[in-house]
Amino acid sequence: MVSLQFLGTGGARWVVAKQIRSSAGFWIRADGTNLHIDPGPGALVRALAQLPPCDPATLDAIVLSHKHLDHAGDVNVMIEAMCQGGWRPRGALCAPRDALDESMQPVVFPYARRFVPREWIVGADESPFEVGSVTITASPRLRHPVETYGLHFRAGGATVSYIPCTRYFDGIVDDYRARAPAVLVINVLRYRDSMDVDHLTYDDARRLIEGIRPGAAIMSHFGTRMLERDPKRLAYELEDATGIKTFAAYDGWTYDVV
């Protein structure tokens, strides 16, 4: 059994600052293995507020796609919770080098890093990383101001692929299509790119879904303009346009992959 639980589906400064949507990231559960992806601000509180609670002490890995605040704000407290205050070192930490290296303004505190016995530097090691029943691989570096990598989680005979924050470029389609994802999670921050920033838009999401052809697509990490236009309605429109089952994630939603 593989499932995704979205603790938070908000992105961008205003949505995060006002917590219009939570910025807590999402969990992957796969045959007894638990991973927390991009634990932004509020991740610990949101995890424990779920019914039933998502217990950080059951986590096998914490994974960062990149070090920006809305993706990594709660990484240290989640490490402490996973390792029970450091008294029970366990699990794995997966993050780009600039999120960890003390010479590169890291977001993971050195003392918290010592609690975790296994570490995978995303983007530096091209070999797959095994965490329980899950195999994690990374895509080549995406186009964002800090080190950012797409991630692929293989478990139960299915692949969950994640496109975090990036500017659109054609290489994304080729790389992700080769992974044949059962589910594609896309961070769709903006409706239109009126500010020329390194984030995906609604139109980019359509191009990605049409090109990659996943089994299903899930939009998340919404900014204010996406929320104003009703992500659920936009997901229906994308499904009609692409022929691919498309969902707009919401806080607390669980999706069963297999």
Language model features with spans:
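Conserved beta-strand hairpin/beta-sheet module of binuclear metal-dependent hydrolase folds
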Residues: 2-51, 148-165, 183
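Glycine/Thr-rich phosphate-binding loops of Rossmann-like dinucleotide-binding domains
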Residues: 14, 45, 72, 103, ...
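Cap/insert and terminal regions of metallo-dependent hydrolase folds
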Residues: 168-254
